[in-house]
Amino acid sequence: MRALTYQGKRDVRVDTVPDPPIQDPTDIIVKITSTGICGSDLHLYEVLGPYLDPGDILGHEPMGVVEEVGPEVTGVVQGDRVVIPFNVSCGHCHMCGQGLHSQCETTQVRERGTGASLFGFTKLYGQVPGGQAEYLRVPFGNDLPIKVPHGPSDDRFVYLSDVLPTAWQAVEYADIPPGGSVTVLGLGPIGAMAARIALHRGAGLVIGVDLVPERLDRASTYGATCLDLRRYGKNLGDAVRDLTDGRGTDAVIDAVGMEAHGSPVAKAAHTAVGLLPDALAQRMMETAGIDRLAALHAAVDLVRRGGTISVSGVYGGSADPMPMLTMFDKQIQLRMGQANVKRWVDDLLPLLTDDDPLGVDSFATHHLPLEAGPQAYETFRTKADGMIKTLLIP
């Protein structure tokens, strides 16, 4: 089959690799029909090379049609249309029973001290082959796949793999009061969808912050009040307080996370890590840190006293101290974590209808063949061509 593989920093290629076989009796094989490029894929593309091997298959936002089932699979049959969550969860352990599928005790990567395995996401999370490929082996075939109806385009359902549950959980964790206010930092796919979900769930004011004109324009179209970071810079806090009676918003969603691109200090750290052998680089990334907390520091400034910060952006080890004194003084609540995809499916599926309240049918800015994946990664990295969300079609 053809698959997009990691080869080195800013070097991904579409190669011919062996088709995945059934390995366990509850496995299924899915023929991929659409697969997204996620912002966290850029962390692999640029920063997390020490945790990758050349040839690793990337991608964790796939959907498709069941091609083959193992002998103990009864939950799906050949020909079923399914979306595959990005976290690999068994559905039966204590953590899955608590709705914490991202902490699945069956697939936790204990030797790394991390949570549930993830498709296409490094040795930190199990080194499971990803979904930017023609076929994908999916374990736990009776529990993990999300069955969706045939008929509507893939655009209707593919974001159940990551974007929708991640954005939904971000809003859930933000705990915005009815008619309340929230600032969304970063209007990439997760931030843009979180802004839409917050408005759909009754927020009275959603402030979106970014510095990419296309992202700001798109969020404005869906009802967000947008602030261009290029204009406000260090005065962003004053601008937000001006819109909220001097208090700041009830909540802030940090949809930025690790500064994988753009920060000179972070860039220098990334370069230094890239010069080290993998074992030393891993240790540096896990202890000294390879990113900055600029977005989180901004969130602490923007949120009102007694408010909530919800972190959905991925961080890779902090190089800045946490502003604990300020957070304590302002009585800020902080919630974060990988999305528990399966937990939110019942909330999300009823919204994926023809009236399309969240705008999923037109959410992708680019649809490209899998063979164009390497160029798509670079375009996404440079924020060129208006690229916000790309679906690759194998």
Show which residues each predicted segment covers.
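Glycine-rich beta-strand-centered segment in the early N-terminal region that forms part
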Residues: 18-35, 48-97, 101-102, 129, ...
